[in-house]
């Protein structure tokens, strides 16, 4: 208990003899110099005064968010409005309130360029009024008393105004306005004051300078700021400027007068497609000798010496190891009058979907057949890919064909063998829909390079063949009419992440044209983005047109939302996305009749989508298109019918009558092509 007594009897007053001053680091009793205290001691009494933090005003934010809701708009119109606002914000920044921008967009019916012009015109009028008032007040001060040399420096001296010069009738912004040179604004003359002399002297000297400049350079005149503001500074390319570009003239200028042609090489597996085109590229100089020597050495080590030229187009290790093309290889070469985009399609039956992707992007085709005994028959008879490839390219819109009868050196350039092959193939191609005048037959040898870029000098061939070589036949193809004037359409064939911001897509522009800075809409994801860059044949360009195979760098969209098969279009004229549509189809050779509920694989451009035939509407006459039978129970080979299809996921389609390139598709079942069709009606 002794400890408790000690605690109870403790005198606490001894601990509180002095008051503690918490506002100081040490007590005043300690001796310390003022300099040391100022250096090491902190005093709250000397704390600097801090202004109260200004609270953020959220009223303006609420007003801007509610400004759109005040206007009763549909969901689609709201999306268009937000898109227009984003575009205008990129040009104007935050200088103009949202309400003014919204009113301008609605007043001009969602036309961004007209709305921008209206807002800029309104700002110009207001700024001119302010300048006029400032001019009048400055004139009054000048008449009253001379301006002191120290106070006469106006804002126009500190921040020089840009003066617009007219050179030979063209408006160009050239330099800054020199102090002392007058510029007329809205009928009032404003003179920048100078140091030293009064304003009257400055006016006199400026008049002398102005007359001297006019006499020395008559075509060069300083325009009023009204002309400058009537054509606002192009912060971003406007749609009006883009529409003024003559795309056809620019296209010819870019290609040096040569026309663009997309060529696909098709044929049965092991017919020699890659070797034929690889050797042609080497002879044209597209592949240097050092690279070709490297391919020859590597192919010899792999035990595939005859595949050296094929390795020019078969770039992946798996393709070189197996000796089979698996994906579409793409490259470029030039002829006398054409710029050719070459697509080497796979010939193996397992890779028909990839072949359809390449053929859907082609304008013309080269069909390669093997002239060896037994090989041509194997590829041409049932189960071979020669027939199927010929039907596919014709169904996908290819009307011009060059048939390269390859490996003729293995049959000693026999004329009888060549005529036998051309007779069988010519009859089949005529049935498939090719005109005789649009089909050419050329005897070639891909390994030796005979009759590829120059006419053969071999006596065994020249004694009976006097026709064109393969390159001359390709050069004689007629390029199709490009849909440059139609709305922009691009089908995605590949998506990948590149260095830097955004991501890249590749594909062929089917219609219209595009420039950097354009906004695009992706369907069916229904997402918008901006074109940051355009690459054509591995070279950056500012624009591209229909027929070009391009790579676009996009920003403002997540890469996860874009898949192979998506179609990019302009936001003003979007493409429709649906799961149900009606189509007119032509049935090929099938063993099982097509009935209601028949499952198929739909191949459309770069899309491969499972589908079901929901309805058999009618059977049509092949020639006239008239209905011969309504609501048939089944369809057999050779019939032309109107059916309704339904896909599992939405796909972006166009009617065949509007866009022929985007209105064709193929139907496959069980590893073989059973029908080709065109879209006639799109259901919701």
Curated annotation (Swiss-Prot):
Region (G2): 323-327
Major subcellular location class: cytoplasm
Annotated segments matching region Disordered: 170-241
Biological processes, Gene Ontology terms: nuclear-transcribed mRNA catabolic process, no-go decay; regulation of translation; rescue of stalled ribosome; ribosome disassembly; signal transduction; translation
Region (G3) location: 344-347
Record's keyword terms, sorted: Acetylation, Cytoplasm, Elongation factor, GTP-binding, Hydrolase, Nucleotide-binding, Phosphoprotein, Protein biosynthesis, Translation regulation
Tissue and organ expression note: Detected in heart, brain, placenta, liver, muscle, kidney and pancreas.
Biased composition (Polar residues): 212-232
Family to which the UniProt record says this protein belongs: Belongs to the TRAFAC class translation factor GTPase superfamily. Classic translation factor GTPase family.
Related illness: Defects in HBS1L have been found in one patient with a developmental disorder characterized by growth restriction, facial dysmorphism and developmental delay. Additional pleiotropic features include sparse hair and eyebrows, deep-set eyes with blue sclerae, bifid uvula with a submucous cleft palate, velopharyngeal insufficiency, C2-C3 vertebral fusion, scoliosis, vesicoureteral reflux with a bladder diverticulum and significant hypotonia. Deficiency is caused by the complete absence of isoform 1 and isoform 3, while isoform 2 is relatively unaffected in this patient.
Name assigned to this protein: HBS1-like protein
Gene responsible for this protein: HBS1L
């Amino acid at each position: 208990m002794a400890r408790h007594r000690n605690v109870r009897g403790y005198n606490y007053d001894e601990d509180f003899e002095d008051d503690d001053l918490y506002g100081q680091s040490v007590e005043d009793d300690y001796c310390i110099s003022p300099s040391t205290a100022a250096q090491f001691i902190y005093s709250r009494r000397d704390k600097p005064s801090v202004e109260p933090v200004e609270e953020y005003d959220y009223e303006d934010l609420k007003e801007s968010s509610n400004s759109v809701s005040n206007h009763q708009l549909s969901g689609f119109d709201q999306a268009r409005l937000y898109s227009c606002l984003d575009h205008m914000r990129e040009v104007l920044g935050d200088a103009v309130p949202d309400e003014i921008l919204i009113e301008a967009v609605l007043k001009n019916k969602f036309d961004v360029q007209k709305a921008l012009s209206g807002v800029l015109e309104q700002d110009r009028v207001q700024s001119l009024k302010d300048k006029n008032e400032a001019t009048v007040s400055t004139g009054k001060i000048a008449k009253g008393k001379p301006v002191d040399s120290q106070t006469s420096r106006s804002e126009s001296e500190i921040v020089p105004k840009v003066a617009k010069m007219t050179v030979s009738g063209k408006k160009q912004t050239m330099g800054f306005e020199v102090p002392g040179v007058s510029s007329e604004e809205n009928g009032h003359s404003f003179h920048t004051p100078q140091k030293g002399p009064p304003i009257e002297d400055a006016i006199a000297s400026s008049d002398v300078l102005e007359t001297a400049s006019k006499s020395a350079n008559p075509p060069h005149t300083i325009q009023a700021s009204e002309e400058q503001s009537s054509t606002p500074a192009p912060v971003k390319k406007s749609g009006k400027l883009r529409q003024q570009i003559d795309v056809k003239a620019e296209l010819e200028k870019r290609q040096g007068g040569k026309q663009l042609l997309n060529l696909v090489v098709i044929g049965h597996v092991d017919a020699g497609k890659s070797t034929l085109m690889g050797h042609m590229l080497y002879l044209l100089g597209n592949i240097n000798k050092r690279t070709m020597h490297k391919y020859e050495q590597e192919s010899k080590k792999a035990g595939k010496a005859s595949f050296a030229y094929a390795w020019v187009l078969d770039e992946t290790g798996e393709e070189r190891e197996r000796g089979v093309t698996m994906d579409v290889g793409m490259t470029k070469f030039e002829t006398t009058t054409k710029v050719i985009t070459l697509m080497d399609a796979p010939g193996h039956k397992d890779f028909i979907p990839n072949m359809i992707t390449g053929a859907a992007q082609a304008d013309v085709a080269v069909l390669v057949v093997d002239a060896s005994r037994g090989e041509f028959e194997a590829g041409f008879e049932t189960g071979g890919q020669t027939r199927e490839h010929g039907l596919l390219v014709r169904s996908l819109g290819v009307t011009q064909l060059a048939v390269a009868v390859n490996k003729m050196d293995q049959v000693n350039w026999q004329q009888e063998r060549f005529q036998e092959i051309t007779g069988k193939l010519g009859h089949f191609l005529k049935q498939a829909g090719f005109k005789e005048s649009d089909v050419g037959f050329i005897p070639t040898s891909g390994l030796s390079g005979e009759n590829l870029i120059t006419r053969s000098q071999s006596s065994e061939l020249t004694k009976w063949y006097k026709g064109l070589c393969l390159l001359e036949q390709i050069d004689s193809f007629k390029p199709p009419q490009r849909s440059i004037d139609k709305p922009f359409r691009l089908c995605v064939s590949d998506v990948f992440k590149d260095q830097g911001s955004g991501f890249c897509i590749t594909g062929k522009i089917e219609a219209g044209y595009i420039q950097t800075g354009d906004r695009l809409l992706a369907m069916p994801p229904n997402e918008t983005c901006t074109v940051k860059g355009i690459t054509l044949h591995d070279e950056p360009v500012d624009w591209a047109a229909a027929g070009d195979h391009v790579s676009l760098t996009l920003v403002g969209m997540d890469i996860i939302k874009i898949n192979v098969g998506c179609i990019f279009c302009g936001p003003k004229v979007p493409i429709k996305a649906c799961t149900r549509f009606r189509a007119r189809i032509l049935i090929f050779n099938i063993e099982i009749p097509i009935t209601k509920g028949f499952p198929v694989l739909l191949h459309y451009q770069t899309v491969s989508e499972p589908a079901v035939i929901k309805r058999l509407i009618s059977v049509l006459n092949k020639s006239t298109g008239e209905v011969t039978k309504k609501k048939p129970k089944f369809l057999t080979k050779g019939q032309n019918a109107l059916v309704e299809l339904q896909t599992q996921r939405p796909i972006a389609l166009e009617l065949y009558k509007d866009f022929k390139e985007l209105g064709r598709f193929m139907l496959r079942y069980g590893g073989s092509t059973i029908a080709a069709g065109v879209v006639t009606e799109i259901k919701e």
